[in-house]
Amino acid sequence: ADFAADREGFLILDEIYQGLSHGPVPYQTGLAVRDDLYILNSFSKFFGMTGWRLGWVVVPPQAIEPITKLAQNLFISPSTPAQYAALAAFDEDAMTIHGQRKDAFVQRAARLSDGLQRLGFRIPVAPDGAFYLYVDISHTGMNSMDFCWRLIDEFQVAVTPGADFGEHNADHFVRFAYTTHLEAIELGLERIEAALTAWGVNT
């Protein structure tokens, strides 16, 4: 915040994964730090409403009018049912369900991490939020693109090459998502083990 303020810059906070931490995280609103922040959020992650195209932005008062004009020229309004669904997402019962989903992500992360490491994959940074693992596949001897294509073509397991997320060592990394249920994760691990065996990769 100080860095941006010293340079008369804007500070934009992307809080799209807010609420999906795997452990307790003290939360303080960004507005307690500065009152001229731009804060972006969405219903797609924590609320599980991917594809509904719903979100919100908190902006300084002087930015409300230009941001409104920009929004009116970039997209049309979401459907009325989607907006009512978004309101319902804040109901007490709905918030309980969201909390249960978050707990399920923690269990899935642990199972997927354990299973992949047992198969020789390295996970340099354990996840502490969201629903992704960034995994080192160096021991397979493949680059990430080849690994991803072969895994989906031959064993019907979809993962994403590291190049989609940056350049640093991207050829050696892929991203796994644990957005599915534990049974599917178990099946995926079985298929990955079969793939490594078929490809002659030592685990």
Where do the model's predicted regions map?
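Active-site pre-lysine segment of PLP-dependent enzymes
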Residues: 1-11, 15-49, 62
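Short beta-strand segments
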Residues: 12-17, 41, 125-127, 132-136, ...
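Conserved core segment of the aminotransferase class I/II
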Residues: 38-103, 110-115, 195-196, 201
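PLP-dependent enzyme catalytic core of the Aspartate aminotransferase-like
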Residues: 141-143, 150-159, 165-203
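Conserved glycine-rich beta-strand-loop-beta hairpin in the small C-terminal domain of fold type I
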Residues: 87, 102-113, 124-137
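Helix C-cap/helix->beta junction micro-motif
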Residues: 6-7, 119, 155
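Generic structural signal for small/hydrophobic residues in well-ordered secondary structure
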Residues: 1-4, 14, 37, 55, ...
